[in-house]
Amino acid sequence: ITVWALLKIKKHGLAYISCRKNHMAHGCCHDLRIDETSTYSEEELSLYSIGNLHVGKFGGTLNTLGTGIDAAERTSMLQQDFVIDNRDRAIKKLKWLSTAPSQLTFHFAYEAYLKGKEGENWLRNSKELADSKELCDECIMQMKKIKRQYKEIMNAGIADSEYELGLLGVIAWDAGQLNFLSRACMEQGYINKDECMICLDAAFKM
């Protein structure tokens, strides 16, 4: 999580995440890229737009199934940020993101944060993390990041409570990344629409 990523979600609210028509009509999305001819339903937009934090970061279109990110920038982003340059790598990455342990990282880090001083010991003694020292270490690192940034997040008005921080974190992290990458990989031709939809459903369930 980054403080300013969460702030952007908080600032634009559902307009940033969903870009729903009623928000657009009231001018909430004036600084965001939207397709005014989009005819997607509320249900479809709710499913497609979980990854819009990432889409907005790269100047994409928020209320479409595709990301709308410039092709050259999308290619560069996939290669440099995610080491995805073909179908096999795309499938491997998306499978990892859509199944444990990847999607558990924020959950464990956040739960450990709520446990205060006992958080790190709780992670190290977790049966679910016992088979992966790498994942356990990642959760500990992210827990410490939440601790460092919590006051700044509260002072900036990004979250009003620990509960709200937890909700924003899922969107900014696990579910958002899976949604975003599946849409980008579909546009890139690495996966087809049916495969993309499987990933979007998995992200939505997170």
Residue ranges of predicted features:
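Polar/charged low-complexity regulatory segments
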Residues: 2-180, 184-197, 202-206
